[in-house]
Amino acid sequence: VLQDTVLFKDTIENNLKYGNETATFEEVKKAGIMSNSNYFIKNLPDRYNTVLSEGGSNLSQGQRQLLSIGRAILADPKILILDEATSSVDTRTEKNIQDAMRNLMANRTNLIIAHRLSTIQDSDVIVVIDKGEIVEQGNHKQLLEKQGKYYNLYMTQFSGKEI
């Protein structure tokens, strides 16, 4: 799941099935529900048969990200790479995307590249890279206790809110 979602001029159903072309409509709809994209799809005039503009330009960035997550749910990879999946969306949309990502990340190996620490704080292992070098690693709690680079980033992003 990339920061810039690739969608093509076709139906939402077919854009989702790009991750698994043999998926049934029921599987597509389940992926829509699990990815939280069903909440906006059900309000579209043709729902899953709605034709997207090239690149999905008739959807918001957050909606495109949710479809990308739905596509990944249908693909069901053993290893999942999330590259800045929430970087260009507002805070409310980020919450929807993070909820969808929890569904997607369950029971698989995940590699998450993120600047927003809210995206990674539930990870088993967090590797902090600064200027191309690994400077810290551990889980969220361990890294906060070290009060190093991760701690400073966390405090900057969350303005000292309770940890």
Model regions: which residues?
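Conserved H-loop
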Residues: T22, N38-P45
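Alpha-helical elements of the RecA-like P-loop NTPase motor core of helicases
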Residues: D10, K42, Q121, Y151-N152, ...
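C-terminal boundary and immediately downstream tail of ABC-type ATPase nucleotide-binding domains
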Residues: E145-I163
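ABC-family ATPase nucleotide-binding domain "signature/switch" substructure
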Residues: V1-D4, D10-N15, A31-S37, R47-Q147
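Short coil-to-helix "N-cap" segments within the ABC nucleotide-binding domain's helical subdomain
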Residues: N20-M34
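DNA transaction DNA-binding modules
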Residues: F8-K9, F25
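Conserved beta-strand edge residues that scaffold enzyme active sites
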Residues: P45-D46, Q157
